[in-house]
């Protein structure tokens, strides 16, 4: 496994961990899509493992895909656009689009997220919460990076 793929896998795992309500399902879904990373910037048919992963995710884990497609900045962190991700699906002959995320019966990724915390009385209160969350994310990222290299 190349260094880039390992970093991508670690970053995707961190992203999945940040989606706390459905952590186990999200982590599994995202990790299954790692074989698609090398095919994102090509115009050829992706490898069979990638296409099989996409087909399975559309059939069994639509909530996860919807979360990935509709979370602002999630794909952008890897220089991937929603159009590129959907184009990869089309090259695998998987016909789905964002309307599947809002179709009747398809779970809404936003519905599973916890409600926002009540606003603090001062800006200082909000800043403290953001700092605490930042330390947690930083710790997770550093732990994953160190486990890859050591």
UniProtKB/Swiss-Prot annotation:
Lipid sites, type GPI-anchor amidated aspartate: 125
Annotated spans, Disordered: 103-125
Keyword tags: Cell membrane, Disulfide bond, Glycoprotein, GPI-anchor, Lipoprotein, Membrane, Signal
Membrane topology: Lipid-anchor; GPI-anchor
Tissues where this protein is expressed: Up-regulated in the epidermis of stems.
CC terms in the record's Gene Ontology section: plasma membrane; side of membrane
Propeptide residues, chain positions: 126-150
Disulfide-linked positions: 29-66, 36-50, 51-92, 64-101
Chief localization: membrane
Cellular location(s): Cell membrane
Function description: Probable lipid transfer protein.
Protein name per the record: Non-specific lipid transfer protein GPI-anchored 7
Organism: Arabidopsis thaliana
